[in-house]
A protein has these predicted regions:
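Extracellular/periplasmic carbohydrate-active domains that bind, remodel
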Residues: 1-378
Length: 378
């Protein structure tokens, strides 16, 4: 005999939360009550609500769902966050579901003007829309993140987390608004996301293992990136990265791996990109081991992040740059076991056909090679 417990519903309105008002206290009370019950759902029904910076902390007594049907609006002034680097944080929860089709509106327009990270490497981080810290066996689905002040969704220390059918939007010129950043996490699956933003659609940081990205639509943005890696000492290895299917349109990069020069030692391996369509994308296929945005680095020595077991298979479409394929590896630790197969990238601009650059790498080739592989070698 299977006993099915009814899920208890905790509606924010029962705690005094009303549309067009600040529901920070009401929502915190609803979460605290729901977290103390085995099997619960926090509901925010249709409407627009103001919400200050808040942490939803576990562990909870059982599975818990955060069901957002309305729109949550962040304070537009970043000073109201009192130095915190997030707006909404879910922390140390097992069996969490975030769902409902609602919108997390970060109101980032004013904060973007204060972002000086392009000039100052030690810039102050602005608030992330949604943090997931140490979340396990959980699912995030059918939500929207809009106009975050900084990253939209940030994962840290998560295990077995699925992200499905999320929509992420911010203008293409909004700084540091990465769509989803994964760090120090494993068993992460991102499926059917629609991301248009001002930085990487998805970025994968150090300590990430077994991350699968399926059928993501990306653009505007900076593409789908592993890295940047090697900026800090004692970074953890990256491995088991799969990018399968999806379409990138008008992005400043396609699929890329980026590491800093003059880096401490590190490794990135078992990374595979396949069946991806590029529509007028700059740098559709890119390994960049001399990544140095805005001149904020030392070029005294090559990167010491070792890249190995990488494949780019069935990557097709159009490149907005003449150099459609760039495999620029480190002189100190050349890339190993790189496979390029069935690549067909056309360049329609001035200056002739697309080219392919290979530096400190000897890729294994198969299938169609357009542009011809390694037309430029240094």
């Amino acid at each position: 005999m299977v006993v099915v417990r009814a899920v208890q519903v905790f509606d924010v309105k029962s705690y005094g939360g009303q549309p067009n008002a600040d529901i920070t206290q009401a929502l915190t009370k609803a979460w605290t009550a729901a977290c103390a019950v085995a099997g619960s759902k926090v509901v925010i029904s249709a409407g627009t609500y103001k919400l200050g910076g808040v942490t939803f902390l576990g562990p909870c007594k059982g599975a818990i769902e955060f069901n957002l049907q309305g729109t949550l609006e962040a304070p537009s002034d970043d000073a109201s966050f009192k130095g915190k680097d997030f707006w909404v944080s879910f922390e140390r929860i097992d069996s969490l579901t975030v769902s409902g089709g609602g919108i997390f509106d970060g109101k980032g327009q004013t904060a973007w003007q204060k972002n000086n990270c392009d000039k100052e490497s030690n810039c102050k981080n602005l608030p992330i829309n949604i943090r997931f810290d140490f979340i396990t066996n959980s699912i995030v689905r059918d939500i929207q993140s809009k106009d975050s002040k900084f990253f939209h969704i940030n994962l840290l220390g998560c295990k077995s987390l699925q992200i499905q059918h999320v929509t992420i939007t911010a203008p293409g010129n909004s700084p540091n608004t990465d769509g989803i950043h994964v760090g120090h996490s494993s068993g992460i699956t991102i499926t059917d996301a629609n991301i248009g933003t001002g930085d990487d659609c998805i970025s994968i940081g150090d300590g990430s293992q077994d991350v699968t990205i399926n059928q993501v639509t990306c653009g505007p943005g900076h593409g789908i990136s592993v890295g940047s890696l090697g900026k800090y000492p004692n970074e953890q290895p990256v491995s088991g990265i799969r990018v399968i299917g999806g379409t990138l349109s008008g992005t400043t990069n396609g699929v890329r791996i980026k590491t800093w020069p003059s880096s401490p030692p590190g490794t990135a391996s078992d990374m595979h990109f396949e069946n991806v369509i590029m529509n007028n994308v700059a740098n559709p296929i890119l390994i960049d081991q001399g990544y140095c945005p805005n001149g904020q680095c030392s070029n005294k020595s090559p990167s010491k992040v070792k890249i190995s077991n990488v494949s780019f298979k069935n990557i097709r479409g159009t490149s907005s740059t003449k150099e459609a394929v760039q495999l620029i590896c480190s002189k100190s630790v050349p890339c190993q076991q790189v496979v390029v197969a069935d690549v067909d990238l056309a360049f329609k601009g001035a200056g002739g056909s697309a080219t392919s650059t290979c530096v400190n790498v000897m890729p294994t080739l198969s299938g169609k090679q357009n542009p011809p592989a390694c037309t430029i070698k240094t």
